[in-house]
Amino acid sequence: MITITEAAQNHFVKLLSSQPEGTQIRVFVANPGKPTAECGVSYCPADSVESADTHLKFNLFSVFVDPISAPYLNEAAIDFVTDELGSQLTLKAPNAKVRKVADDAPLIERVDYVLQSQINPQLANHGGRVTLMEITDDAFAVLQFGGGCNGCSMVDVTLKEGIEKELLQQFPELKGVKDLTEHQRGEHSFY
């Protein structure tokens, strides 16, 4: 469920050494499955462990995860990175905003997952997003752009060279993508 590097484990052991005996680590997701999802790490006093928590045992400490956060922390990774500017704990949880779907889920769910977890975070850098409207009977993913992508002069390149290539690579059963958006250039447009 959660991978913790050796450097991060050592950091946790150091932090826990100054806490009351029995204190462990809790990893959680606030607003799981939503665009506003945020991951967190906190101390977990012994009296705050719930019977429904997932208990992950590491060499010198344990991590507890509440049942609501657990599916959103699948494939999460915690690292402790040190560089010339200092050090910091990093937590990457690719499924925090969108729960990973099963490999045998319907095509529309799998495509939507890739859009939400891989494509939209990139588009968000420009204030944009894309929504899957449908998959047609002839295997085209019909998309609608929003935010900074609506009216952007680069939207055709983004659609064909970025999104379509990625989706066709991951889903060979698709024939392509179509843009349903009525693009209106304005101040919101990125380019």
Swiss-Prot record:
Q: Which Pfam families match?
A: Fe-S_biosyn (PF01521), NifU (PF01106)
Q: Which Gene3D superfamilies match?
A: Fe-S cluster assembly (FSCA), HesB-like domain
> Any idea which positions bind [4Fe-4S] cluster?
149, 152
**Which ranges form a coiled coil?**
none
The cofactor remark states: Binds 1 [4Fe-4S] cluster per subunit. The cluster is presumably bound at the interface of two monomers.
Known role: Involved in iron-sulfur cluster biogenesis. Binds a 4Fe-4S cluster, can transfer this cluster to apoproteins, and thereby intervenes in the maturation of Fe/S proteins. Could also act as a scaffold/chaperone for damaged Fe/S proteins.
What family name appears in the similarity comment?
Answer: Belongs to the NfuA family.
The protein in question is named: Fe/S biogenesis protein NfuA
Organism for this UniProt entry: Hamiltonella defensa subsp. Acyrthosiphon pisum (strain 5AT)
